[in-house]
Amino acid sequence: MAEQKSSYGYEELLACARGEMFGPGNAQLPLPPMLMVHRITDISETGGEFDKGYIRAEYDVRPDDWYFPCHFMGNPIMPGCLGLDGMWQLTGFFLGWLGEPGRGMALSTGEVKFKGMVRPHTKLLEYGIDFKRVMRGRLVLGTADGWLKADGETIYRASDLRVGLSKDSEGQ
């Protein structure tokens, strides 16, 4: 298991994506370009909105990011689903960070609201994930609420983000 730190840099997140942080068969982040986090600035097992733990992270937006030319030509916008996926990525990372075994999978979310867009001129995305509960059984299930800020303005909110870790999920 990884040393339980309160922040992680990009190279450490890449190590997690390669399966080197939490051990074989356990939680991993995706590799770029699907990795939607550049650094975890704070993570704790306590605190947050529900006092069940939280994670804060950042993503540096670049005008030449891969999604801008194709979504949409002449009207570049980061797909909202990528911000939502970043929230799921962080929820799964938290479960692995807690030392829970198994491979991660996004399961569902309650309500998602988009109130703004990420454009090429946007500089910084900030994520906040506040945990409501972690259930431990055959499947480890994390439930959290999340938000995404673009240059300091909250533009996405998601309730009841659910990510599971399963020991039965074999990598192919």
Curated annotation (Swiss-Prot):
> Can you cite an annotated GO cellular component?
cytoplasm
Pathway listed for it?
A: Lipid metabolism; fatty acid biosynthesis
Subcellular localization? Cytoplasm
**Is Zinc-finger one of the keywords UniProt gives this record?**
no
Enzyme Commission number(s): 4.2.1.59, 5.3.3.14
Q: Keyword Lipid biosynthesis on this protein? A: yes
Q: Name one GO biological process term.
A: unsaturated fatty acid biosynthetic process
Residue pairs linked by disulfide bridges in the UniProt entry:
none
Q: Quote the catalytic residue positions.
A: H71
Mention one GO molecular function: trans-2-decenoyl-acyl-carrier-protein isomerase activity
> Catalyses which reaction?
a (3R)-hydroxyacyl-[ACP] = a (2E)-enoyl-[ACP] + H2O; (3R)-hydroxydecanoyl-[ACP] = (2E)-decenoyl-[ACP] + H2O; (2E)-decenoyl-[ACP] = (3Z)-decenoyl-[ACP]
Keywords per UniProt? Cytoplasm, Fatty acid biosynthesis, Fatty acid metabolism, Isomerase, Lipid biosynthesis, Lipid metabolism, Lyase
Checking InterPro entries in the record gives: FabA, FabA_FabZ, HotDog_dom_sf
Q: Tell me, how does this one assemble?
A: Homodimer.
Give the record's family classification. Belongs to the thioester dehydratase family. FabA subfamily.
Q: What does this protein do?
A: Necessary for the introduction of cis unsaturation into fatty acids. Catalyzes the dehydration of (3R)-3-hydroxydecanoyl-ACP to E-(2)-decenoyl-ACP and then its isomerization to Z-(3)-decenoyl-ACP. Can catalyze the dehydratase reaction for beta-hydroxyacyl-ACPs with saturated chain lengths up to 16:0, being most active on intermediate chain length.
Q: Which NCBIfam families did the record assign? A: fabA (TIGR01749), PRK05174.1 (NF003509)
Question: What protein is this chain from?
Answer: 3-hydroxydecanoyl-[acyl-carrier-protein] dehydratase
Its ancestry begins with: Bacteria, Pseudomonadati, Pseudomonadota, Alphaproteobacteria, Hyphomicrobiales
**What is the gene called?**
fabA
